[in-house]
Amino acid sequence: VLPATADTRTFVTKSIPLNIPLLSSAMDTVTEARMAIAMAQAGGMGILHRNLSLEEQQQQVRRVKRFESGIVYNPVTLSPTQTLADAKALQTKYRVTGFPVVDEKGRLLGIVTNRDMRFASADETPVSKMMTGKNLAVLREPADLAEAKSMMHARRIEKLLVVDQQNKLTGLLTIKDIEQSVLNPDACKDTKGRLRVGAASTVGDNGFERSEQLIDAGVDLLVIDTAHGHSGSVARAVERIKNASNYVQVVAGNVATAEATRALIDAGADAVKVGIGPGSICTTRIVAGVGVPQLTAINDCAEVGAKTGIPVIADGGIKFSGDFAKAIAAGASCAMIGSMLGGTDEAPGEVILYQGRSYKSFRGMGSVGAMAQGSADRYFQKEASAEKLVPEGIEGQVPYKGPAGTVLHQMIGGLRAAMGYTGCATIEDMRTNCNFVKISSAGLKESHVHDVQITRESPNYRVG
């Protein structure tokens, strides 16, 4: 098997495929809409953190779903009696540059674009005076992308309206979406051509309300995000969400034992997240004295998942692309990474200059700062005041890494190399056909760079 021919497609749940087996972690210094977009365009998926208000998290879900949409079904519209001020407000809210104009029955009347608004000076100018209503470029259902691209090129336009046989607006197509499809052929998309996105929620009534609202916003994957997934509250949360919606897929975690995996699968989880204490910023194993070494945990949990066809996700402990390959070889269907993506352009936060080098802040969701901001219930400390919190993580900084795409390229390149070395053509082969060899401390030392001083840093190998 040549690395270039290795097939990296996998499933995060039975019904959600990924083109690369990577998720970005639901951490407030890793994943917001910008990271989720980058992950989905690369073929993976981003999980939006929940240290956001419900409205902000919903807005970020919508932002990802609208970023690259194929045909935008039910686009934001204006009526002819609305004003320039209304159009500007919607433009700011939804980050779009044009609006179809429809009557009260949904029939298409025209379109208002950025160019139309630029030449209207008064905020009270009605939409009917600004819109282009004649000689509209319209595509009738069923829409064909090749025909749409040809029409856009011929008319020198960037937006195309899709209507049914009664001239009712059914969708909107933009040249940006067509171009993005060409630039990102491996993007992870839903059946409507929109980027896929996940979001973290929690347990209890507040968690259920958040989950319902995220489902309404169009989220593809809900992650019940707790530090201890083998608890009654997590199982009840999974059951409650699955009873409320057959559409949404639910990931539950975190766990580290076969028994815990079995309990969450019995509760209805579509995937189980594995990892207690392996993360670079996590102190659970030291503070609580609880945890299982990550490779052992993945192996034990994956054996249970394999019996029911439920995937497990390796969450934490991945420092190099080789660790990622080992997680897959141990039985994980995909891996969740945090510190690898912390410090990239798409991660939230500003670049900090420290001792001549650039860094970005990075913290665990069990750190004092993150818990005080809203993630305390992840560690079942919701009622504790700030000074009474018992943290299970730290706050720090990681080197600035540039675009997330560069990191993902190196990660997938390392995985492909591992698949080539082991003769595994697919991720399923990798999960089931690899053998592990015990290694001593001397063997580990030998595995790393030794007896030489590094003069030029490699993009996929950093020590310290």
Q: What does each model-found stretch correspond to?
A:
Residues 1, 78-79, 140, 150, ...:
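Alpha/beta catalytic cores of nucleotide-metabolism and tRNA/nucleoside-modifying enzymes
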Residues 2-18, 25-27, 56-96, 101-103, ...:
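Bateman/CBS regulatory modules and CBS-like beta-alpha motifs in cytosolic regions of diverse proteins
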Residues 4, 54-62, 120-124, 144, ...:
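Active-site-adjacent beta->alpha loops and helix N-cap segments on the catalytic face
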Residues 19-24, 70-75, 190-200, 240-256, ...:
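Short beta-strand/loop segments at the ligand-binding rim of alpha/beta enzyme cores
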Residues 35-36, 209-217, 256-274, 314, ...:
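Catalytic cores of alpha/beta
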Residues 41-56, 219-231, 270-288, 318-352:
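Glycine-rich phosphate-binding active-site loops on the catalytic face of alpha/beta enzymes
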Residues 49-51, 77-78, 98-100, 138-139, ...:
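Catalytic beta/alpha-barrel core
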Residues 50-64, 101, 105-121, 152, ...:
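Terminal amphipathic helices with adjacent charged low-complexity linkers/tails
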